[in-house]
Swiss-Prot record:
Any one Pfam family match given in the protein's UniProt record, by short name: CopD
Keyword set, alphabetical order: Cell inner membrane, Cell membrane, Copper, Membrane, Plasmid, Transmembrane, Transmembrane helix
GO biological process: copper ion transport
Protein name: Copper resistance protein D
Name of the gene: pcoD
Length: 309
């Protein structure tokens, strides 16, 4: 039961911190020159606020669960403040919690600038959100090596986290934009269409970064051995995750090369309702697949390739 709870908390942290980083980041490169008529459409302040508060709570729960596991006590109520302090002060994962909390509170502070200085606010939130997201690397396989390989594997994992966070944040942004049906008009649909076009280039960079960093991570975790893919739970989950990633690529390709251009044409013709609905369904499907992948990632971090099943 404790392992299941830990996996759920890890999953929620992955999703939450990726939104905190990816949503304001998307506003920097994906949404610019917003007109007054569509200002509310692109206002993500309430979503980011909720994510930050949730991230602080989840980090606190994660601190308790990990400290409990390290202390060896069977009941969480037996966990002492002394043990928690020791984990925080003497372990890398403990230090990462403090860094994450500082970054999350910084993000919370940057939200106060959102209304009057949105670009500056999003820039600050992207940086602090990126730091918060990066701390997840110290809770998985990225720190299993020593020396130079420690830093190379960590850099690869940070790249993977950043790229995944950028993609997840963009999906959340598009989902929010497309779900606000009562605010859709010619101007708002133009904002969505333009944002899709801007994400096309960023999406290519994200996919390349994900693939390359995934290969490096696998080489480090499995030591270049293909056997764990087929004789361990870790390998089978990784294969399932890879299949889902391919599905995401197909959906993203459909958005970029078919649904996006079609929406652009329909906007010019003034008949965009059907195209918006199709794009909404595609984005939501892609987002659901992304959520399942994050669940797999949270599970993978609790397993080792050497655990044959």
């Amino acid at each position: 039961m404790n392992d299941l709870i830990m996996i759920v908390i890890r999953f929620l942290l992955y999703l939450d911190l990726m939104v905190i980083f990816g949503l304001p980041f998307f506003q920097i490169y994906g949404i610019s020159g917003v007109r007054h008529e569509t200002y509310n459409l692109t206002n993500f302040r309430s979503f980011i606020t909720f994510a930050v508060v949730t991230g602080i709570i989840l980090t606190g729960i994660n601190m308790l669960l990990v400290s409990n596991a390290m202390s060896g006590v069977t009941d969480l109520r037996e966990l002492s403040i002394h043990v928690i302090e020791m984990v925080i002060e003497e372990t890398d994962v403990g230090i990462s919690w403090i860094v994450r909390l500082c970054a999350l509170f910084t993000t919370l502070g940057a939200l106060f600038l959102y209304t009057n200085k949105r670009v500056l606010s999003c820039l600050l939130m992207t940086m602090s959100g990126g730091v918060a997201l990066a701390t997840l690397a110290w809770g998985g396989h990225a720190v299993m090596h020593d020396g130079l390989h420690y830093y190379l594997h960590l850099l690869s994992d940070l790249t993977h986290l950043g790229a995944a966070g950028a993609w997840t944040g963009a999906l959340v942004a598009f989902a929010i934009l497309l779900m606000r049906r009562n605010e859709h008009n010619a101007q708002s649909v133009i904002v969505i269409s333009d944002s899709l076009a801007k994400f096309a280039t960023a999406g290519t960079v994200i996919v390349v970064a994900l693939i390359l960093s995934a290969l490096v991570n696998y080489l480090y975790i499995a030591e270049g051995n293909l056997t764990p893919l087929f004789n361990s739970s870790w390998g089978r989950i990784l294969l399932a995750k890879t299949a889902l990633f391919v599905l995401m690529l197909l959906l993203a390709a459909a958005n970029r090369f078919h649904l996006g251009p079609r929406l652009e044409v329909m906007v010019r013709e003034g008949n965009y309702d059907r195209s918006v609905a199709l794009m909404r369904n595609s984005i939501l499907t892609e987002f659901v697949v992304a959520i399942i992948i994050l669940g797999a990632v949270a599970w993978l971090g609790m397993l080792a390739p050497s655990q044959v099943s």
